[in-house]
């Protein structure tokens, strides 16, 4: 439940940077709010095979289901598709001398990771997501 200082407009969660800093761990804040990337093979969900739903660590928005998760060997949790297409936004990212597609939470605009066209079927996509941006709700 949002606190009194959290604004929700058109299903968007808007908080001050001070609120985000209070509510998120340092690594969650760095990833979700500052677009950082956790070190490969360091995230808690990279090798987690439990069944469940992955939600945004910032706002609880449903993002990915465990049945879409696969081991890509890249060092981050990878998914073939979002649980609900409209729950993620994509933006062109030209940082670090690369052209990539950034994946963001559609509800709080938190940085999740990137999507690449080199995944397995059925989509051929690899959503490469930072563990720090996620919380697993086990089934």
Curated annotation (Swiss-Prot):
Signal peptide: none annotated. Residues 17-139 form the MsrB domain. InterPro entries: Met_Sox_Rdtase_MsrB (IPR028427), Met_Sox_Rdtase_MsrB_dom (IPR002579), Mss4-like_sf (IPR011057). The keyword Isomerase does not apply. It catalyses: L-methionyl-[protein] + [thioredoxin]-disulfide + H2O = L-methionyl-(R)-S-oxide-[protein] + [thioredoxin]-dithiol. The keyword Ribosomal protein does not apply. It is an enzyme of class 1 (oxidoreductase). Zn(2+) binds at residues 56, 59, 105, 108. It comes from the Bacteria. Binds 1 zinc ion per subunit. The zinc ion is important for the structural integrity of the protein. GO terms for molecular function: peptide-methionine (R)-S-oxide reductase activity; zinc ion binding. The active site is at 128 (nucleophile). Coiled coil: none annotated. Keywords: Metal-binding, Oxidoreductase, Zinc. One of its GO terms (cellular component) is cytoplasm. Its EC number is 1.8.4.12. Its cofactor is Zn(2+). GO terms for biological process: protein repair; response to oxidative stress. Belongs to the MsrB Met sulfoxide reductase family. PANTHER family: METHIONINE SULFOXIDE REDUCTASE, METHIONINE-R-SULFOXIDE REDUCTASE B1. This is Peptide methionine sulfoxide reductase MsrB. It comes from Bradyrhizobium diazoefficiens (strain JCM 10833 / BCRC 13528 / IAM 13628 / NBRC 14792 / USDA 110).
